[in-house]
Amino acid sequence: MELNKLKLTELVPLISKGEVRPHEIIIDVFKRVQEVEGKVKAYITLTVEKAYDMAREAENAIFSGKKSLLTGIPIAVKDNICTKGILTTCASKILYNFYPPYESTVTSKLLNNKYILIGKTNMDEFAMGSSTENSGFHVTKNPWDLERVPGGSSGGSAAAVAADECIAALGSDTGGSIRQPASFCGVVGLKPTYGRVSRFGLVAFASSLDQIGPITKCVADAALLMNVISGHDPMDSTSAPIESSDFTEYLGKEVKGIKIGIPKEYFIEGMDKEVEERIKDAIKELESLGCIPVEISLPHTEYAVATYYIIATSEASSNLARYDGVKYGLRVQGKDLLEMYMKTRSRGFGTEVKRRIMLGTYSLSAGYYEAYYKKAQQVRTLIKNDFEKAFEKVDFIVTPTAPSPAFKIGEKIDDPLQMYLSDIFTISVNLAGVPAISLPCGFSEKGLPVGLQIIGKPFDEAGILQLAYAYEQSTPWHKMKPLL
């Protein structure tokens, strides 16, 4: 048995019964990493020695009767989530030597469970991108087709899960950065409600949009990981005062009579025909399970991309002002303080990060604040209202995750607008702060995965997981693996 190929929900009972030891699992995981990492390049940092130490700690906990839910489970963590004493770069040269002096809340919760950290995964620099081509270190490849992108910005996490280089992973989602890579790599990605999972220790991109979530091999694994990472955190002022619940309780429950909204604005010209066909097939499958499709309208969808790129870049220009070479990270010497700031930021940040800082600074400038930033916030409210009105009629909203399957490496990197439009179906969810999941719903003729997005009401992750699980169990797509 190749233990690295098992799901989280398969390994947990095996560890509990003593049939499998954590040490054995990580041997298989690192064997797989050795086989395929040279092709996939999912990781920035592999924590091999640390992983074996953690495996010993996990085994000691098991033998002393102190096993927790995720004890002995190898998990990969996106490289913008702080791990104390372990290199955390955000895939940026400006943080090439940053070892956080503290632990993020989500990894603290995993540590309390005695998990095993496999490594820190590659990403678009500071989570700005949709392809993982903007990494300051290397480009991650899609395990289904090594000439294509894995999506972004959590491309390393999604690729690692798809390639069985870990059992599960954590990502972050600001405008689709968990869901779009999950769609491209044929895995499951959940973006929780804003405030459901603590952001303490997540390196900020856009503070009103960022959210940490799981990337897993199946829906039940996502539910299990959510049990551990969700819940109120006093260290995060935006954390919702809602404690974690058992999300696995809802798996397998009846979905008959559930109303699913189909927004007409999400079936647009320019969308890949095969994606449209797979989504329509998925809607028929949900109908056969007893769900009731209802056509709805989210009328301000057409403004979502513009709204997002004003708000997100404005917040980024403020958040990234702290990287100046003084306290940590890259420092390039200059003849005075101002020159040091300029040289450090010029050499440390990549092209896309510089572009977004400039755009955000422009939007916040005195002459344009009213015309851009303030107006974008007003449109954001309209988008949020669209969802509230829709959820008066339906229980969930079903859409494509992305307008196309994974595109070729280099295909969109020189065309920012085309790259930005690849998040057109995911961005509104972040602007509204609602939860959404992406799960596999078929393949293109070229064998590339297609993702189905299910959007729920605020804090109804349990309902999303219930519906996603029902669909997943009635289809074979989650069982498909890339041939690497």
From Swiss-Prot:
Any one cellular-component term (Gene Ontology): glutamyl-tRNA(Gln) amidotransferase complex
InterPro entries: Amidase, Amidase_CS, Amidase_dom, AS_sf, GatA
Keywords per UniProt: ATP-binding, Ligase, Nucleotide-binding, Protein biosynthesis
Domain of life where this protein originates: Bacteria
Enzyme Commission (EC) number: 6.3.5.7
HAMAP family: GatA
Protein name as it appears in the record: Glutamyl-tRNA(Gln) amidotransferase subunit A
